[in-house]
């Protein structure tokens, strides 16, 4: 019992909806308390299937078809593809956890355009604000790249500012690395020392923002899904949390009160 992360997509070929639901039902029956839907491009799910079901259709089918499932998350999603139905599920469905990971990549519009992203900086900020307004306990994560080709100091600063502007609680920071044969590899490159420095600066801003957010959770009541070690797990907003008491059975969901911080997690 515990948390399972399984990919329901393979090589950008979507697994049929009925098969995903059957997988979810079987895993739930085996004792898994939480499932995570993840894939190469999660929000484009269903485009290559008969009837072109949307990700929101898949989530609804899982929740209806696996009534014993207690918690569901989705992996990284594209801001441009969060439609009204998916937004409603993320913000109103009790079994959907209050945590979403957005594929943002950068906070500068020119860099986003050169990355061929489908959203602008304003789109990202607006979506983050909508999510937080509709579900104030939502924790937003994001992928951010430091040192993409042609990024200057001003563009890097706009990406750092995005951490606060988009209420980012969990940031995955990636220093840019050129891949031969890609359009980006043919653009003017940022030097390796500058890339490393910008990645470090992003991590510092993200770390400070996360610590401030974690501190705000002290004294709050949360639900913890106990994982395999019996003494830790994740609460609904995905904050890593350790029990300060005796071990509990893996897979059990416990009501807890947050007592303090434990490094980059809670206790």
Can you annotate each of these PLM segments?
Residues 1-18:
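Canonical Radical SAM [4Fe-4S] cluster-binding loop centered on the CxxxCxxC motif
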Residues 20, 37, 74, 102, ...:
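Conserved, mostly hydrophobic/aromatic
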Residues 29-153:
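Conserved SAM/AdoMet-binding glycine-rich loop
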Residues 46-64, 68, 115, 178-208:
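Radical SAM enzyme [4Fe-4S]-AdoMet core and its adjacent flexible, acidic
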Residues 134, 153-154, 158-202:
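C-terminal, non-catalytic macromolecule-binding modules
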Residues 178, 185-267:
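Terminal RNA-binding accessory module
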């Amino acid at each position: 019992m515990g948390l399972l992360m399984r990919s329901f997509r393979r090589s950008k070929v979507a697994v049929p909806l009925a098969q995903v639901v059957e997988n979810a039902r079987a895993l739930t029956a085996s004792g898994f308390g939480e499932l995570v839907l993840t894939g190469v491009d999660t929000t484009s799910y269903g485009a290559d299937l008969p009837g072109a079901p949307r990700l929101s259709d898949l989530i609804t089918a899982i929740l209806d078809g696996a009534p014993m499932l207690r918690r569901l998350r989705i992996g990284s999603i594209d801001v441009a593809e969060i439609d009204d139905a998916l937004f409603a599920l993320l913000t109103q469905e009790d079994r959907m956890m209050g945590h979403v990971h957005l594929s943002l990549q950068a906070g500068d519009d020119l860099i986003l355009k050169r990355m061929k992203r489908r959203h602008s900086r304003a789109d990202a900020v607006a979506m983050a604000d909508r999510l937080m307004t509709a579900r104030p306990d939502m924790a937003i994560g994001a992928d951010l790249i430091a040192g993409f080709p042609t990024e200057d100091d001003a563009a890097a600063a706009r990406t750092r500012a995005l951490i606060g502007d988009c209420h980012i609680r969990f940031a995955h920071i990636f220093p840019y690395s050129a891949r031969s044969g890609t359009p980006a590899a043919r653009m003017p490159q940022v030097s390796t020392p500058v890339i490393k420095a910008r990645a470090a600066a992003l991590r510092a801003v993200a770390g400070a923002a996360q610590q401030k957010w974690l501190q705000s959770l002290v004294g709050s009541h949360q639900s913890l899904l106990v994982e395999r070690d019996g003494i830790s797990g994740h609460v609904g907003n995905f904050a890593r949390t350790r029990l300060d008491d005796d071990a509990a059975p893996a897979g059990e969901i416990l009501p807890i009160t947050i007592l303090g911080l434990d490094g980059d997690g809670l206790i």
